[in-house]
Regions:
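Active-site histidine-anchored catalytic micro-motif
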Residues: 2-166
């Protein structure tokens, strides 16, 4: 290659580098957040609005939201938010599935509700993954985000939110 051709290549490469620098390069962003919920014993606790309120403050328009609960005796579910009978029936079903009977379990040191709480947690979810499109969480018309508390006494629960997107 002669010097003129080499110089031409250098000029061409320099122009390409300038073009690349001028282009806006978008990177994926990540944001972490914790929602603290104080429960008053067994039942479902809707945290949809708290999550949506936090999402509305973020700069991310499209992405994935992962929510996980940092406990082994409560869980997360997406469930109908229109008819409270659904939540009542679900709680009753799980109470029958994992009854509070000390004779059934070895792990009873934290109370009669402890092992049934672990079973219910194992059968449901400890994390949820949802899509975010145009700053809107993709949920069905009747869907809400719930913490499903399996213990009888009040607890403070931590829900870790991890949003990834652009």
């Amino acid at each position: 290659m002669c010097q003129a051709e080499e110089l031409e290549d250098v000029i061409k490469n320099t122009k390409e580098q300038r073009k690349r620098r001028k282009r806006k390069i978008e990177y994926m962003q990540q944001v972490f957040h914790e929602i603290i919920l104080k429960t008053k014993g067994q039942g479902f606790y809707d945290f949809t609005e708290k999550t949506l309120g936090w999402l509305n403050k973020q700069k991310i328009n499209n992405g994935i939201l992962n929510i996980n609960i940092l406990h082994t005796s409560a869980s997360l579910v997406i469930q109908e938010n229109a008819d409270p009978d659904v939540l009542h029936d679900l709680k009753n079903f799980f109470d029958k599935l994992a009854p509070m009977d000390d004779k059934l379990y070895k792990h009873t040191t934290e109370g009669k509700d402890d092992m049934p709480a672990h079973i219910k947690s194992a059968l449901t979810n400890n994390q949820l993954t949802l899509s975010l499109k145009n700053k809107k969480l993709i949920l069905g018309s009747w869907q809400g985000l719930y913490l499903f508390e399996h213990r009888l006494e009040q607890h403070t629960r931590v829900l870790s939110h991890h949003l990834i997107g652009d």
